[in-house]
Amino acid sequence: MEMGKAAAVVLAVNGKRYEAAGVDPSTTLLEFLRTHTPVRGPKLGCGEGGCGACVVLVSKYDPATDEVTEFSASSCLTLLHSVDRCSVTTSEGIGNTKDGYHPVQQRLSGFHASQCGFCTPGMCMSIFSALVKADKAANRPAPPAGFSKLTSSEAEKAVSGNLCRCTGYRPIVDACKSFAADVDLEDLGLNCFWKKGDEPADVSKLPGYNSGDVCTFPDFLKSEMKSSIQQANSAPVPVSDDGWYRPRSIDELHRLFQSSSFDENSVKIVASNTGSGVYKDQDLYDKYIDIKGIPELSVINRNDKGIELGSVVSISKAIEVLSDGNLVFRKIAGHLNKVASPFVRNTATIGGNIVMAQRLPFASDIATILLAAGSTVTIQVASKRLCFTLEEFLQQPPCDSRTLLLSIFIPEWGSNDVTFETFRAAPRPLGNAVSYVNSAFLARTSLDAASKDHLIEDICLAFGAYGADHAIRARKVEDYLKGKTVSSSVILEAVRLLKGSIKPSEGSTHPEYRISLAVSFLFTFLSSLANSLNESAKVSGTNEHSPEKQLKLDINDLPIRSRQEIFFTDAYKPVGKAIKKAGVEIQASGEAVYVDDIPAPKDCLYGAFIYSTHPHAHVKSINFKPSLASQKIITVITAKDIPSGGQNVGYSFPMIGEEALFADPVAEFAGQNIGVVIAQTQKYAYMAAKQAIIEYSTENLQPPILTIEDAIERSSFFQTLPFVAPKPVGDYDKGMSEADHKILSAEVKIESQYFFYMEPQVALAIPDEDNCITIYFSTQLPESTQNVVAKCVGIPFHNVRVITRRVGGGFGGKALKSMHVACACAVAALKLQRPVRMYLDRKTDMIMAGGRHPMKVKYSVGFKSNGKITALHLDLGINGGISPDMSPMIAAPVIGSLKKYNWGNLAFDTKVCKTNVSSKSSMRAPGDAQGSFIAEAIIEHVASALSADTNTIRRKNLHDFESLAVFFGDSAGEASTYSLVTMFDKLASSPEYQHRAEMVEQFNRSNKWKKRGISCVPVTYEVQLRPTPGKVSIMNDGSIAVEVGGVELGQGLWTKVKQMTAFGLGQLCPGGGESLLDKVRVIQADTLSMIQGGVTGGSTTSETSCEAVRKSCVALVESLKPIKENLEAKTGTVEWSALIAQASMASVNLSAHAYWTPDPTFTSYLNYGAGTSEVEIDVLTGATTILRSDLVYDCGQSLNPAVDLGQVEGAFVQGVGFFTNEEYATNSDGLVIHDGTWTYKIPTVDTIPKQFNVELINSARDQKRVLSSKASGEPPLLLASSVHCAMREAIRAARKEFSVCTGPANSAITFQMDVPATMPVVKELCGLDVVERYLESVSAASPTNTAKA
């Protein structure tokens, strides 16, 4: 074969030409952008195509047609060589500080749709790509001025694949919908463009949008491509020095295969590389063959027999082609729209998906639906071209890389007498989630002349993703159904046969649930084949008068609606104004600098953790598999490399304890750091760490303690700190003696939750002169990190400088748990005397993170017949993991939030268990989230025992102020500030709530297989005030620099501090404080500049930082006031700049520092809120849709309503994830196995409430608080338990309908629902066998036993 020198990869990035020669073929586009260009907008959030942080727009030009095609793509999966001669546009390319911001960026900013900002550039590009696609659609009418051709529904779906952990998505959705021509602008939420309620919403007030403003494919690249066409056509096969091969025909591909330099282990065949997001490469390949350039693989042929799709046709293109077809094709297209996410579908290929399904245990939706549609495949093996049915292809032994899938043919079925349906059950309705089970059914029917019933002539039943190697056809069921008319007895027998055919393999999760899903799907399909509508209603459970019939809508397609009610105050302006977040535009453009965006210093090295996979074992040795990656290792840092005088410490906190940095000599939990691989690039470090071979020994070691039960049995506990230990209330025994009824030893379990900050743990350590070191670090604890790093490497604190500018999300996970990264970088940097950077891959981050505390609770409660509770006792078991972290303090908030109700008398026994798992940490609302849920579980249980309305029991047991003071002491504050009862009554006692509750009852009476529930919960949250420093410095030009102890995590701290600074100095300005806002800059946290910075956490850092700044401003005003008065006497009005110039000349100190400490009589206060949620569950699948949530939250006098609203919504949605969907699963050794976006599902835009209403109330002023404000960061998370409680109500309705009496209570209405209530949990509580039992009852009730289904 003729070999030619490789041509360099040429591409345009934001209009600028880049050329890359000799680049490693495994280099991704994201890696190239971040290391070879100034671009920093695309971020590495997951490396799996599952988060959207890396989304870019790729534009391809066809010189033959002179057309440019554009699509969004996940740059973390896209290989650099695959975008040769393409143009790439990032968030910086559509708008930036220099050239001005794009309307997408401006609207995201103005709708308050960015908090930490790490996800925002990817959001921008997903929206921008959707706009480009819609505006190029020729078949759509021109939109009104200022709008695009997008519809509201399309605008929401544009970001369906993008994750955001901060905002709760509602403001992002509003920004998206602002571009839609069919939107009612009055429905959009709080923004900076018009004042809601006071000014009319008008598109002219929005940043103007015109399609085509951004050039996505530069002319210079078009010219180069045109000039190279002839040369390319006559050139030999491009065989490159860098290992990237682009055959232009199948013959060329086979010549490559026949070359002696190719073997199975060294070559990877790629079309889009999206498969690497599913099956992460354990090593690097040295040769890649890109088959996308083979024209035959891109064919799309359509005739009267069907549609042929080439194997490298993208899923998005397939959707486009199939959407313009018959019923079967359109149904396939609709299902494909729920596979992956838009930016993955744009590049992922139909053939690649099917080949993965054939080779690997891949849960493919595409294989299942194409199997049901009777598809065939054409493959080529060597010179042989073969055609198989898809079923035959899937059943063959896994094909090797030399077997080439050429095309897939989907036959034309027509529409007459053909019924085709597809099904999937997944945690997210719009895709970006693997199915628990998928299925597709095709039936051809005819009319039976004698009975006039529909007769099944032929049928295909395909099932996939249920735990088998590949999708299958249920042949026995098909054979049984052929020739039959559908009746309840026929369906019942088909279901029984199916249960014998669907057999999840050993080790599959939720096997009984998966079988039940398959039954549900078959039942639903066969029911639709019933001839009589009335008889069909017996199965579907609907009737013409039901709300379900009246609202014949797919609730997952409803545009998200919202309402915000906010009271604004001008008492302290600009404090109290809803100004947009500081720095939000540069977050949207991608110019905001996070730690990994700092350019790599000269000679920088990169690290990756090697972690234990054993929960308790001696580490005997570390070796590496022979591989390309292991050849790149420079060294491995372990405990022996800690400098003399240093200590093996990864974190430490006063009075609590510490955790080792390295396992030495025993690994005490699966996921513990054993060593750090150091390599020349981050990719090589990642890959080498995966190649580590650890030799373990368990000789002379006890078995690991992994569960709360294990710890209690072996008495393995941490001691609760006495000064934070919760205190009992009253006399429990006396309270129980007064009770009319008792519930004894009931149990509830709560599992863990992962933080899922969008920015993984990251640090950059740079050694400096005189044994000093500077660490750029993403942390909530700069000061503590400084202290721990110094202790670890054995140097004075003043030799360690920790700098934190902004953090891409924290939620408690960037507190103690993050310090290991900084310490590891410091040890390596000082040993090697070179900068060392670590950026954890998402899997390692998730395995080491620990997360929220799992708990097991046993409770006994006594209560009166009227529902008044007289006594409660808890046995509380808390899994703290291997080291203390914050666990010794966790019992206090658990009991504290539980105290929202007046239990009469409260006693408890808490055990914080020490176990061989990663230490658990403080995650947003730590302990409080669990405690508030426990309280609701008990209230629900009492209500069930009394057959009483749950809200009546809640209201009966809410505190009056006197009992509140008994339970909370000084934290209760003044009676005038107790707003909980008012808020609860506002929701639960309103006529609207009563009407909605009646509608829910009506819906449930009318619908058998869908049930609704509604619930209202109160919350109380105690926060602690902590000392905080602040410093305000006025420059000679009048600009102002502010430093505070708190760190900007996305919570709006900088924004509130800016407002407080302007307020504090405003009395010196003619225009008041508002005129100073643009002059204030809050600068990064720096431990050598601002000492005693403390902790950014606990929800109060913003307000305490503001108060420290206000006190600094008071000092400055005192200094400047005499000068101002003197100038006013001479000249009248004094401008700010003149005042500062004069003060500088007079040598006035223009910098003031304050260290605010709380009043000893007021160190804590209570926050209150109430939330109502209405949900709908699918009894057949366990899926839950949140129809509506109404939140009322007491924000005091809000320092910034836009910021506080964002905190309320974001916390609530994070809580929804905790209570419903986030399953942080581990294996039998305690090693996290839900370790990426593929398996761990946080909420997305399609899982938030369809109607999302928030009211911020301003409670009575309290001058003890900072300008009467209140915290908003954590308390609202507790309101998400309203969703869990509403789900319980819906499940109760289903259990009553089907007489399901599972659980210890053996009751339909009394049952325990643990956290999280995932789809399998919901379905199991509704009854895994409800379909069979229902069919049995219908069959038995039918006189002829052949009732039509």
From Swiss-Prot:
Gene3D superfamilies from the UniProt entry: 3.10.20.30, 3.30.465.10, [2Fe-2S]-binding domain (1.10.150.120), Aldehyde oxidase/xanthine dehydrogenase, a/b hammerhead (3.90.1170.50), Aldehyde oxidase/xanthine dehydrogenase, molybdopterin binding domain (3.30.365.10), CO dehydrogenase flavoprotein, C-terminal domain (3.30.390.50)
Subcellular locations according to the entry: Cytoplasm
Catalysis: reaction(s): indole-3-acetaldehyde + O2 + H2O = (indol-3-yl)acetate + H2O2 + H(+)
Keywords: 2Fe-2S, Abscisic acid biosynthesis, Auxin biosynthesis, Cytoplasm, FAD, Flavoprotein, Iron, Iron-sulfur, Metal-binding, Molybdenum, NAD, Oxidoreductase
FAD-binding PCMH-type domain ranges (all copies): 237-415
Known EC number: 1.2.3.7
Origin: domain of life: Eukaryota
Any GO BP: abscisic acid biosynthetic process
Xref: InterPro entries: 2Fe-2S-bd (IPR002888), 2Fe-2S-bd_dom_sf (IPR036884), 2Fe-2S_ferredoxin-like_sf (IPR036010), 2Fe-2S_ferredoxin-type (IPR001041), 2Fe2S_fd_BS (IPR006058), Ald_Oxase/Xan_DH_a/b (IPR000674), Ald_Oxase/Xan_DH_a/b_sf (IPR036856), Ald_Oxase/xanthine_DH-like (IPR016208)
Domain 2Fe-2S ferredoxin-type: 7-94
GO molecular function: 2 iron, 2 sulfur cluster binding; FAD binding; indole-3-acetaldehyde oxidase activity; iron ion binding; molybdopterin cofactor binding; oxidoreductase activity
One GO term describing the cellular component: cytoplasm
Binding site residues for [2Fe-2S] cluster: C46, C51, C54
Tissue: Mostly expressed in coleoptiles, and, to a lower extent, in mesocotyl and roots.
Named cofactor requirement(s): [2Fe-2S] cluster; FAD; Mo-molybdopterin
Note on cofactor: Binds 2 [2Fe-2S] clusters.
PANTHER family registered for this protein in UniProt: INDOLE-3-ACETALDEHYDE OXIDASE, XANTHINE DEHYDROGENASE
Subunit and interaction comment: Aldehyde oxidases (AO) are homodimers and heterodimers of AO subunits.
The family this protein is said to belong to: Belongs to the xanthine dehydrogenase family.
Role this protein plays: In higher plants aldehyde oxidases (AO) appear to be homo- and heterodimeric assemblies of AO subunits with probably different physiological functions. Involved in the biosynthesis of auxin.
Name recorded for this polypeptide: Indole-3-acetaldehyde oxidase
Organism of origin: Zea mays
Gene label: AO2
